[in-house]
Amino acid sequence: MKRLATLSLLFLFLGTLAVLIPKEAKGQSAGLVSAVLNRMERNRQSLKSLRSGISMEKYNAQLRDTDRYNGIVLYMPAAGRDASVRIEWQSPQHEILAVSKGKYTLFRPRLNQAIVGNKNSVKGKAGAGGIVEMMYMSRQQLEARFQPLQDVREETLWGNVSTIHLTLVPKSNSSFKYAEIWVDSLGMPVQTKIVEKNDDATTMRLTGLEKNVKISPDEFSIKLDANVKIVKG
């Protein structure tokens, strides 16, 4: 179920497009924090669709080993919990994950297998705890759950992308230690890093962003051949 964890983490990543971050700490780069929050809000309001490259690094702290993945992601926000997402991993193996109308399909061509299920069931099976919930939390819930913003600073990512770096630390028990977000000059979160309690870490990066391009709703539905084995997730 490792790819289901990917789904949870992606929702956290894309969820930063749609939620408000907790209030900043007094005296901690207040002007910088205010500016980046304003950019994020403007980006959230203007974003109707997104197509981009996506890379992911999953670090295993026990083995001190990193797995790397590359692909393409499509994202279309919607009211409530109905945002649509499609990730097509191109390496190291071809897999397609589509989420729409509260359902997900994970298609593995090499196995001729598709895992299908309710998106809300992912968090329990993915080992990612309440990560999915973060996408839908209100500002009040976020402020209750997270400490004030930490480690607020300017940082240039590879590809010469200028960003503001933010760190979110849960106030109480959570499935992860902390989350880091890198926001570009237009208010777009272009990179996130989730560090779990066992020090495993997942870093996601968006590249070649195309905002507000026309995306057909059909992109979020995978047409499966009759001979594909269906597994309930």
Model-derived features: positions:
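Bacterial N-terminal signal peptides that target proteins for export
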Residues: 1-10
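A short, amphipathic edge element
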Residues: 34-35, 139-151
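Beta-turn initiation residues at beta-strand->coil junctions
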Residues: 56, 107-110, 193-197
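Acidic/charged, solvent-exposed loop-and-adjacent secondary-structure segments enriched in E/D, K/R, S/T
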Residues: 105-137
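C-terminal segment of classical bacterial N-terminal signal peptides
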Residues: 14-24
